Each structure stands twice: as structure tokens, then as C-alpha cells.
Regions:
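Amphipathic alpha-helical and helix-coil boundary elements used as assembly
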Residues: 1-637
Length: 637
């Protein structure tokens, strides 16, 4: 019998089994600790995704931006092309996906994202499915929000914002912040939560990035420094250095002390620079740029932390200017991610210094992998730092919630409508007055509950001030006239000053009913519900063109420390319903012509002598008799 020829289809021959059993599965390659090849696997809800399909992968990570990823694969990888469009693939929209990069038998990096977009492209009967998505930070883009934070650190604000989101999807890390001090007043105004965090990172010089698993705020770096050797994984690298002006002065104004503050770049103490290329660029910059310009720094400036803010701003600005180097490279190491430190070594094993990854793109086509990265020297302040970034805000109304300024500066605290839900309010803010100065000025402070119009210095939502007060539909003055005739000051207690242009009058009233009226026709009427007192340190003069009338319901008392003179141009009449008494040490009556005394009875009495004298005659007349009596003698001459 002829031997069976295996070339023509023998089955299960031991030689064949031994030969083909040696072929390894994909899982075997993933577990191979000696393989430098990079493999990519995907999982959704704990299950493998596109396990048996070819796909291309790209994901992009950049500091202070949303990370993104794109997968493209054949449309029939998920959908039956004879079925409805995206019949199965559409169910993956909004799902959380895990992208794993394997090398040397282990997962070197996992990127977790959310599928946010599906695109099915059909052409010539074939389809291509593009699956794109974002890091979980995209959840922070749920709509515009307005709120404020008072006396909180940057870390506390960050935790307050992210606490509203599921921790199993959006994990956060805060570590080694560049800004440690308490922030007096921080505003999120018509911004998404992510836009707000981005702005804080830019303004306060903080690294904000997603490392594939967590949203990181601060100067955190990876658990180890990743070496990239030019002879192993570093494909190519470029180094760029430049010069920038290094000298500057910041000037600001402190509201509470009423003084200007200055700090220059020489006052800032920074970390030691160990990168020799950076040191060269720094020295060259100082040789090129000599002028020290003076710039206005516009801090929050609403409390006594202004100098601390200025000090921090100068330090961060100086470090920003000393960032004179950027490195761009391409590598095959899949463990690189943003926020990591990488140490570069050239082909001759010479170190090319250590750098922080601030941007990286990963590419995998199913067969090969590489990444392209951007890095800078390891500095505390990121390259996008800008201390002149702030939330823009337009003028708007608010309600006064406190006016008892602890520093007696005439400030108030107000609450905007968007602060009411969380019972937030501004710190003490100033208000515009017609005139002000030390111990003088115009002191009109709005009452608690009153509506005011608030402006913002330079449009900065964190620098509000009161422009003035105004009425609304439910709170009117009560002084409206069709001719706009009335100008009035009316205080909380009921004190009024009313100027009436129609009448030409001025009316002043207090809560007790005391009034002062100038009627516009030459008349003044003063009314006191109780007492009226006039005091003068020297003289009081009263003049009337015609008559002066004084009336009292009971008594009128006049007193003079020395002389009391009353003069009448014609007649002087004094009437008393009861008795009339004149009391004085001496009384002298002088008439240029006649003195007439008329009464029922007239009695003259002296303790000593009575003398009657005349230059001519003395006549005594009586209708009846004249009696002259004396206790002793009577003499007539």
C-alpha cells in the first residue's frame, strides 16, 4: 500500500499537529515579556471591543485641553451591511471605552474615554465607521454656570466643582499646587465648569490635564522618570531655544491701605535651574533686553491680600519668561503620557536633560505604534500662564445684603440674582459717591434690600463696585410727576428734603413732623411739633420789612446778660390782661413832651424819699379834695 501523501490533505497527522500547534494566539503575543512590539486592545463595560477587527487608533493629549481619540474600522466590524444603518454601532454612543497599550507582556498605558460621536461613511458599497470621543472631562461641559467662591483655596474650588460628577468616571488628583494661598473672591460667570477650571489654570499658573485615568490639577508628575534613548525608542528629537525679555516691574493699587505697591522681577525667588540649555538662553535674553518696563497688575484688590497676590504674580511671570526652551520628538515607547517627565539620552549615551510632557499624540495602525510629543523643562509654571485672564462680566443689578462695613469705608456687600440659589454674595465692595475724602465727602449708603447697579473694573467679574441705585416696578419713589417737577431726598426713617420746581418750593420734614417750608413765593414757614431753639455764639439779628409778631400759648421770657433795649419808630404799646410789673435797680422815665398816667387808683410808695421837682409849676387837681398827710410835720414853701 502506498504511503499517504500529506501534501494532499492528510488530517490530524501528529507532525502537522506539532507544527501548527506552535502558532501563537494574539493573547500569547500580549503576554510575551520579550516582545518590543506595541499592541492595542479595547474594552467596553468589561468586554473586549473590536477584538477580531482591524482598526486604526489615534488619541491626543494636551495640557489644559480636552483629550480626544479616534478609532476607524470597517463598518461591518459592528454592523451587518445588509441591515439598517448603524443598527448595532449606535448603541455604543455615550459608552465608556478603555484603550490599553501593551508591550513586554504588560499594559503600559490605559486611556479611559467616552464615545461622543459616530460617523459612518459609505462609498462604492463599502462603509467605514469612525468612532471618536473625549476624555471624561467632557462631562464638565454640561452648560453655562454662574457662581462665586469666597475665601477658598484653588484646591477647594476645584474639589467643589468636580464633586458634582461621578467619581468612578471622573477621578481627580490635586497635588503640589503653584497657588497655595486663600483666594478672597473667585467667580465663575457664564462658563461651563471646564471653561472655569481652564481659566483658573491659566490665571494662577497651574497644570491642568487628564493623564488617561484622572483629571490632575497641580505640579504632579508620573511615578517615575521615563528614559528615552536615541538608540532604542527615541526616533527623533528637536530642541528649540529662544530669547525673551526678563526684567519687568508690576505696579498695583491696594484699596484698603490706599497706597500703590510695586515689585520687580529681581524680587522673585525661583527654583534652581539645572537645564544648561535654558541657562544659556536666559543669559542671552538678559544681554539682548535691558529695559525694565512697568506694567499695571490688576489683582482682585478687595482686601488686604493684594501684596501677596502681587508677589505670586511676579514669581509666576518671571518663571514663565524663563521658559525659553521647547522639545519636540517622536518615540516608540507607549508608556509616555502628558504630565510625565522623560529623560532624553542621545545615541552616544550622553544625557540631553529631563523634560515635562505637555502634549502627546499616540498612533497605532494595528501593526505599528509611535507617538509624537512636545515637552518643556520641568517648571512650576506652565507655558500658558496669563495673570491678566479673568471672567468678563457686564453691568447688572444686585441687592444690598450688608452695609455695616467693618472698616468704615462706606462699602456694601451685594447679592446678584445668580448668587441667590446658593446664598452666595460679594465681599465688601466700594460704591461711587459724588465726592469723597478723608473726613469729608458725600456719605449716602444704600439700605439692606435695596436694588443697586453694579459695574466691574476692566469688566472683571471679581472686581465689582456699585455704580448707583435705581427703582423697579415694585419699588418706586412716590415722587413722580408728569413734568418731572420734584427732586427729593427721602431716608429710611422718613426724613425728607423735597425740591419742587413747579412751585419753586423747598420742603424739609423729619419723622416727628417738624417742617421747614420755603414756598417759592417769598415765604418761609418753620414748624416744630415740640420745642424750637435758636443758639448763636455771638449775635442774632432779626429784621422785618413790615411787622414782627410773637405769640406764645403761655409765657414769653426775655433775658439779657447786660442791656435790653426796645425802640419803636412811632408808638410802643404794652398790654397785660393781668398785672404789669417793672423791676429794676433804678427806673427812669423820660418823655420829650408829656407823660400821662391813667388808672382807677395810682399808688406811689418809697421806702425813703419821694421827690417831685419841676422847672416851673407843679399843679395838683382833684375833683373833690387834696389830702397831704405826714406822720410828723408837713411843710409847704
Amino acid at each position: 500500500m502506498d504511503t499517504y501523501n500529506s501534501d494532499y490533505g492528510r488530517l490530524n497527522h501528529p507532525d502537522d499537529i506539532a507544527k501548527y500547534a506552535s502558532l501563537r494566539s494574539f493573547k500569547d503575543f500580549l503576554a510575551d515579556k520579550s516582545s518590543p512590539l506595541v499592541y492595542c486592545t479595547l474594552t467596553i463595560e468589561g468586554k473586549s471591543f473590536l477584538e477580531k477587527s482591524h482598526f486604526n487608533l489615534q488619541f491626543h493629549q494636551k495640557t489644559n485641553e480636552h483629550d480626544t481619540f479616534t478609532l476607524d474600522t470597517r463598518a461591518d466590524s459592528l454592523d451587518n451591511e445588509e441591515a439598517y444603518i448603524m443598527e448595532h454601532s449606535k448603541s455604543y454612543l455615550g459608552k465608556t471605552i478603555h484603550i490599553h497599550l501593551h508591550r513586554f507582556g504588560e499594559i503600559k498605558q490605559t486611556f479611559t474615554g467616552i464615545i461622543t460621536h459616530l460617523n459612518l461613511l459609505k462609498k462604492d458599497g463599502y462603509g467605514r465607521l469612525y468612532i471618536t470621543g473625549h476624555a471624561p472631562t467632557i462631562m464638565l461641559e454640561q452648560g453655562l454656570e454662574s457662581q462665586s467662591f469666597e475665601n477658598k483655596t484653588l484646591e477647594e474650588i476645584f474639589q467643589d466643582i468636580t464633586a458634582q460628577y461621578p467619581k468612578d468616571t471622573l477621578h481627580t488628583i490635586v497635588r503640589n499646587n503653584n497657588t497655595q494661598n486663600v483666594l478672597p473672591y473667585t467667580v465663575q460667570y457664564n462658563q461651563t465648569d471646564y471653561q472655569f477650571l481652564q481659566q483658573l489654570a491659566i490665571r494662577y499658573g497651574e497644570y491642568l490635564y487628564y493623564n488617561g485615568q484622572s483629571l490632575v490639577l497641580g505640579n504632579k508628575v508620573g511615578p517615575k522618570i521615563i528614559n528615552l534613548d536615541e538608540s532604542v525608542d527615541l526616533v527623533h528629537v528637536s530642541f528649540e531655544i529662544s530669547v525673551k525679555p526678563q526684567q519687568f516691574t508690576y505696579t498695583t493699587y491696594d484699596v484698603e491701605s490706599g497706597t500703590s505697591l510695586q515689585r520687580d522681577s529681581a524680587s522673585a525667588q525661583l527654583q534652581n535651574k539645572v537645564n544648561p540649555y535654558q541657562l544659556v538662553a536666559l543669559k542671552a535674553s538678559k544681554n539682548v533686553f535691558h529695559k525694565k518696563p512697568n506694567k499695571l497688575h490688576n489683582p482682585t484688590g478687595i482686601n488686604n491680600r493684594t501684596d501677596r497676590e502681587l508677589q505670586d504674580a511676579v514669581r509666576k511671570q518671571k518663571e514663565l519668561r524663563e521658559n525659553l526652551m521647547i522639545v519636540k520628538g517622536k518615540s516608540k515607547d507607549p508608556q509616555l503620557k502628558q504630565g510625565d517627565l522623560t529623560k532624553l539620552v542621545d545615541i552616544n549615551d550622553r544625557p540631553m536633560e529631563t523634560y515635562r510632557i505637555i502634549e502627546i499624540q499616540h498612533f497605532h495602525d494595528g501593526n505599528s505604534y509611535y507617538n509624537e510629543f512636545v515637552a518643556i523643562p520641568d517648571l512650576w509654571t506652565p507655558p500658558y500662564f496669563d495673570d491678566n485672564t479673568y471672567p468678563n462680566c457686564e453691568e447688572q443689578t444686585a441687592r444690598v445684603v450688608d452695609n455695616n462695613d467693618p472698616m468704615s469705608m462706606g462699602r456694601v456687600r451685594v447679592q446678584f440674582p445668580w448668587q441667590e440659589r446658593k446664598n452666595q454674595k460679594t465681599p465688601w465692595i466700594r460704591l461711587i459717591q459724588p465726592h469723597s475724602g478723608a473726613g469729608k465727602g458725600f456719605h449716602f449708603i444704600p439700605e439692606i434690600g435695596e436694588e443697586v447697579l453694579v459695574g466691574f473694573e476692566s469688566g472683571n467679574a471679581e472686581k465689582p463696585f456699585v455704580l448707583g441705585t435705581h427703582y423697579n416696578g415694585s419699588e418706586t419713589s412716590g415722587y413722580h410727576t408728569s413734568g418731572n417737577d420734584v427732586k427729593a431726598i427721602h431716608t429710611r426713617s422718613g426724613t425728607k428734603i423735597i425740591l419742587n420746581d413747579a412751585q419753586g418750593s423747598v420742603f424739609i420734614e423729619d419723622p416727628s413732623g417738624n417742617t421747614w417750608t420755603m414756598d417759592g413765593h417769598g415765604n418761609i414757614n418753620v414748624n416744630a411739633s415740640k420745642n424750637f431753639t435758636v443758639n448763636a455764639g455771638e449775635n442774632i439779628s432779626m429784621t422785618a420789612g413790615m411787622n414782627i409778631t410773637t405769640s406764645a400759648g403761655m409765657n414769653i421770657t426775655e433775658s439779657a446778660g447786660m442791656n435790653h433795649s426796645t425802640t419803636a419808630g412811632a408808638m410802643m404799646i404794652q398790654n397785660a390782661i393781668g398785672d404789669f410789673s417793672l423791676l429794676a435797680k433804678n427806673i427812669k422815665k423820660i418823655a420829650h413832651e408829656n407823660i400821662q398816667t391813667s388808672s382807677n387808683d395810682i399808688t406811689k410808695q418809697a421806702l425813703k424819699d419821694i421827690t417831685v421837682s419841676s422847672q416851673t409849676n407843679i399843679n395838683k387837681h382833684a375833683k373833690d379834695e387834696v389830702f397831704v398827710n405826714s406822720g410828723k410835720n408837713t411843710k409847704n414853701h
